[in-house]
Amino acid sequence: MEVKPLKKLKLYGFNNLTKTLSFNMYDICYAKTPEHRDAYIQYIDEEYNAQRLTSIVTEVARIVGANILNIAKQDYDPQGASVTMLIAEEHLGPENPDDNPFDPVYTDKEGPLPDAVVAHLDKSHITVHTYPESHPHGGISTFRADIDVSTCGQISPLKALNFLIESFAPDIIVADYRVRGFTRDVDGKKVFIDHKINSIQNYVDRKYRDLYQMIDVTVFQEYIFHTKMILKDFDLDNYLFGTAKKELSINDKRKIKQRLKKEMAEIFYGKNMPRM
């Protein structure tokens, strides 16, 4: 969905508003044996390695209309990965198009960085970190990815929301969006938000709204928007790793379903739950 600016809003100078989208997604599965758990962690570690995450955040930068200044990526031992991308609203490449802006010969030149780069160094960035996790009791394994998209200027991270949902297809999503700082109009009046929003749900495509149950917590006067999403439908086959549903007894299916639903409820509501 398009991010609609406020009508007749003419700004003076640079747009100093900082807009941040925090997108936390969870994937949950049941891995019966230690071998299955290890295989799940290895699968996640390969599926969402630093290279794959880099391609995702690169597409996020393209969607929001940002230019990439620098990328740092890392795979961790025994598992997990992270990518940090520095972005800017305007193109900040070298005057000579044949020069590589990421070449140390170019970036390490003496003298001050361009003003636009300095303005963006600690404001406009995309980061992603992954957290595979399992516990020997109960057979539940989880995977969490945290993506933060922070922009300074006119570009909005909300444009990338649906792409992130599509890329990870998570069981649970916890999304936070906030706007900080202020800019001024041509008359000097402060502007604390420059686009229309009353819920993150405004920017979620209908096809995803139909798939997820969603709840909101909004503190509009503080420009804080919080939305939680959990899949409506539950198919046990989608949560089994290394085991087929047909291999389980009716009693085992019931117990595993209860464990998975309890795990998902605890993650969704952010607290430990009684037996379900």
Swiss-Prot record:
It catalyses: S-adenosyl-L-methionine + H(+) = S-adenosyl 3-(methylsulfanyl)propylamine + CO2. Is synthesized initially as an inactive proenzyme. Formation of the active enzyme involves a self-maturation process in which the active site pyruvoyl group is generated from an internal serine residue via an autocatalytic post-translational modification. Two non-identical subunits are generated from the proenzyme in this reaction, and the pyruvate is formed at the N-terminus of the alpha chain, which is derived from the carboxyl end of the proenzyme. InterPro entries: AdoMetDC_fam_prok (IPR003826), S-AdoMet_deCO2ase_bac (IPR009165), S-AdoMet_deCO2ase_core (IPR016067). Pathway: Amine and polyamine biosynthesis; S-adenosylmethioninamine biosynthesis; S-adenosylmethioninamine from S-adenosyl-L-methionine: step 1/1. GO terms for biological process: spermidine biosynthetic process. GO terms for cellular component: cytosol. Its EC number is 4.1.1.50. The modification Pyruvic acid (Ser) is found at residue 124. Gene3D superfamilies: S-adenosylmethionine decarboxylase. Its cofactor is pyruvate. Binds 1 pyruvoyl group covalently per subunit. The active site is at 124 (schiff-base intermediate with substrate), 129 (proton acceptor), 152 (proton donor). Heterooctamer of four alpha and four beta chains arranged as a tetramer of alpha/beta heterodimers. Catalyzes the decarboxylation of S-adenosylmethionine to S-adenosylmethioninamine (dcAdoMet), the propylamine donor required for the synthesis of the polyamines spermine and spermidine from the diamine putrescine. HAMAP family: AdoMetDC_2 (MF_00465). PANTHER family: S-ADENOSYLMETHIONINE DECARBOXYLASE PROENZYME. This is S-adenosylmethionine decarboxylase proenzyme. It comes from Desulfitobacterium hafniense (strain Y51).
